[in-house]
Amino acid sequence: MHAAMQRGAPDPSEIIFKALLAASSATSDKLAEGNKASPKTKPPYRLLTVAYAANPSDITMPERPDGTRQVALDFVALVYDREGYLFTQQSNTVNVFAKPAAIDQFLKEGVRYQQRIAVPAKGEYYLRVGIHDMIGDKVGAIEIPVASIATTPEQSKSQPAK
């Protein structure tokens, strides 16, 4: 997984997925919850939301004696500058033992997960996102220039959402 997540590395395609990306138009002095930052990283930040949608047929789901299936995935988002220096990172591991009904739903709807990661508001950065199937040791990853990610308007606190 480490080599697959390096800035500029070829995109591994053992797990095919889509990533819906949205950047907050507002800035924040705080990292997104769970983010780790290098000492070089300074606020303000723009928060990005990453919504993963992966093909379930690419995920290893061994059946257990009790009829459940184990799914163990690591969702990783890394922010690099153009020289490849790592600024912020977010990694979330999901390890579940799913009953047959849940697996049926999983197969119909796909693998879905959402993360937030902070990106320094000024400068040229690249977001590399990936999924690691920890049971099958398969990886999928893509890299996106942060400047190409659309911003979403913030909801006004005084205006109700429509």
Question: Which stretches of residues belong to each language-model region?
Answer:
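Scaffold/interface architecture of coatomer-like assemblies
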Residues: 1-162
